[in-house]
Amino acid sequence: DYDIRTQTQYYVVSHLAHAYEDFNLQRDQTLVDYDAKYVDLHNPDGKPDILQQIEHGTLGLIAQHRTLGRAIPGIIVPDISQYTHLGDGLTMTDNLIYDKEMDPLETDGYKSGKFDDRWAFTSKSTPLNYGSIAALAAASRVLKGYNDELAEECINTAINVWKEEHSKEPDLFHHGNTTGGTLEDEELKAAVELLLSTKDEMYATRIKEMWPTIDKNFNLHAGRVMKILTYMDEDFKQKLKNRVKDYKNEIAEHRKENPYGVPIGRRGWAGNSQIVSYAINNYHLHKAFPDLIDKEEVFKGLNYLYGTHPDSDISFVSGVGTKSKKVAYGMNRADFSFIAGGVVPGVLILKPDFPENKEDWPFLWGENEYVVNVGASYIYLVNAVRDLLNNQ
C-alpha cells in the first residue's frame, strides 16, 4: 500500500539510525539529488546510502512538527479506487494540487480540479508524539557531520516535545495501528533515545521510574535498555541482570512450542517482524550478558527468515537464498513479481494450527506484503549476525 504511516516511518528511521550507529554501514550505490528531485540506483554519489535514507525519513517526520507542532497518524489517498490501485504509485494522483474552483478536467499545469490529493490525518496522540521524537533523537546522533542543521533541529524538537507532553495531560486518542503503541512503551523509547543523545540525567531518572514497563514488556524493551547501562545506577543494573535471568527461562519456552526456538505469532498478520525484533533483542542481551544469552538465540531469528520455518524452506527475503520469495505484495504486485531485499510477513498460522504461506498469490497481505519497517530491522539483524560471526 502507499499509505505513509508515521509509526512505520519512525520505526524505519530508528532501526536505520541504530544500524549505522552500531555497524558503521558505508555502502554507497545510490545517487540522491533533492534539488533535481532525482534518484538513480547503482550510481554512487559519495554518500552512505543509509544516511540518505535516514535523512529522507527524518525530513518526513520533522515536517509534521514544523507544520502542526506534533506527529500525525499519516497520509493516504482519499478514494477506494486509489487505494486498490495496482500500478505505479506515481499514477495514483495527477500530481497537481487540487483547486475546488476548477472543473474536474481543468488544469493550469500546477493545479487541477481533480479531487485526488492525498489526505493528512492529524489527530493528536501523545504516544505517537513520543515515538516520533524517539526517532528524531536517534537520527540527530547519526546526522551530525552529515546534515548538521537537520540534526540540531531534530534534537531540539525532541527535547521541546518531551517538555510539552510532560506539562499536560496526555492525548490518548487511539485508532488501530496509526496512533502509536501504549503511552508507557512509547514514552520509554523517547526517554532512552533522549538520554543517549543528551546525556541528561533527567531522562535516566524517568527510565528508572518506568521499571515496571521494562519488566512487563521486556521482550519489547530489552535491546534498547542495554544501550543505556553506562548511564544507570547499580540498583538498576542489578534489577536488569535479574530480569535477564528470568527472560532466559522465558525464551526456553519457545523451544517447547516449536522446533525453531522463536516466537511464532498466531494473529492475523504473520510474525516475521516479531521474530526479527526478538533476535535483535537477543543480540543486545548476548553482548551485555554472554553468560546468560547464547548467540544461537540471535542466529535462530535469521535462520527462520532464510528457510528454517514451517510450511516450506523458502527464504522470506526476496533474492536471498537458493529459493526465495518471488511473488509478493509490493509496488509490482500486479505483475506477480518481487523486489530484491523485501521481507514478507511469513507463515500465517490458520486456526487452530495450520501453517500457510502462499507462494503464488501476492494479495494475502498478512503473508506476503513487503513492509519497510521489517526491511529496516532485517538490515540491523543481518549486520548483528555478521558481527557475531566475525568475532567468534
Regions found by a protein language model. Name each.
Residues L16-N24, T58, I62-H65, L136, ...:
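Sec/Tat-exported extracytoplasmic proteins
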Residues A19, I54, L61, L68, ...:
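Alpha-helical solenoid scaffolds that mediate protein-protein interactions
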Residues L25, Q29-A36, G57-G60, T67, ...:
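Long, compositionally biased, intrinsically disordered segments
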Residues S125-N129, I133-L143, A151-T198, T213-M232:
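Aromatic-lined, polymer-binding surfaces characteristic
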